[in-house]
Amino acid sequence: MENRKNFFHLHLISDSTGETLISAGRAAAVQFPHSNPIEHVYPLVRNRRQADAVLQSIDKEPGIVLYTIVDPELADFIDRRCIEIGVPSVNVLEPVIGTFQAYLGPLARRRVGAQHVMNADYFARIEALNYTMDHDDGQMAEDYDQADVVLVGISRTSKTPTSIYLANRGIKTANIPIVPDSPLPESLFAAKGPLIVGLIATSDRISQVRGHRELGTVSGFDPSDYTDRASIAEELKYARSLCARHNWPVIDVTRRSIEETAAAIIALRAKPR
């Protein structure tokens, strides 16, 4: 019998920072130890245009959708689109709000992110989230010097969820894919401010996770090589060599949770450079 864990996509859509939703999703996922969620976190989704872009991404990598959206019309839009796509969805807050209303009476009004105190720390986190979402997967490469952290790594080394976790702690984080024969942007090497960290994992782990990604969405790869362990080993060799050449620290995420990877990065930031 094969012992390999099954992977599934877990899409988390929030109109705020997403912390509440991440906790709920992980609390549920941990009850299924033989299934491993591939988290996709979409914070600050507050209008139909943003929601539609998210749902297009979900359509390419179907899975379970959890969302905390206070606006009833936007929540209804997400629910209907999930039905059209054919994926299960749960509005995590709605049953709780319904119970509160039944006991306390109708809401005066619904407030996005009302659980967060509007202080300097909160606004720093929102600024970090905005920066991180704008600089996901190599986007907006011209201003990496404004980042606190830049994560580099081959496809499926948890760069995006780690970036969002760090952003939720007020750390502006960009991430860039390492693709052999595709040079990294010169702006990265010119940046003096950020800590640059390489993320790696074992070939087996990456192959398993990549096997659950729709190959048509992957650029820069021959589909036959994308999940091939020998090809992945070559990608990892290139990534390690690149990080060693530039003296960038490397973290192996194979057996680390997102929280553990983020904690290791935060510890690296605390060290003199």
UniProtKB/Swiss-Prot annotation:
Keywords: Kinase, Nucleotide-binding, Serine/threonine-protein kinase, Transferase. The keyword Transferase applies. Its EC number is 2.7.11.32, 2.7.4.27. One of its GO terms (molecular function) is protein serine/threonine kinase activity. It is an enzyme of class 2 (transferase). It catalyses: N(tele)-phospho-L-histidyl/L-threonyl-[pyruvate, phosphate dikinase] + ADP = N(tele)-phospho-L-histidyl/O-phospho-L-threonyl-[pyruvate, phosphate dikinase] + AMP + H(+); N(tele)-phospho-L-histidyl/O-phospho-L-threonyl-[pyruvate, phosphate dikinase] + phosphate + H(+) = N(tele)-phospho-L-histidyl/L-threonyl-[pyruvate, phosphate dikinase] + diphosphate. The keyword Nucleotide-binding applies. ADP binds at G153, I154, S155, R156, T157, S158, K159, T160. InterPro entries: Kinase-pyrophosphorylase, PPDK_reg. HAMAP family: PDRP. Bifunctional serine/threonine kinase and phosphorylase involved in the regulation of the pyruvate, phosphate dikinase (PPDK) by catalyzing its phosphorylation/dephosphorylation. Belongs to the pyruvate, phosphate/water dikinase regulatory protein family. PDRP subfamily. This is Putative pyruvate, phosphate dikinase regulatory protein.
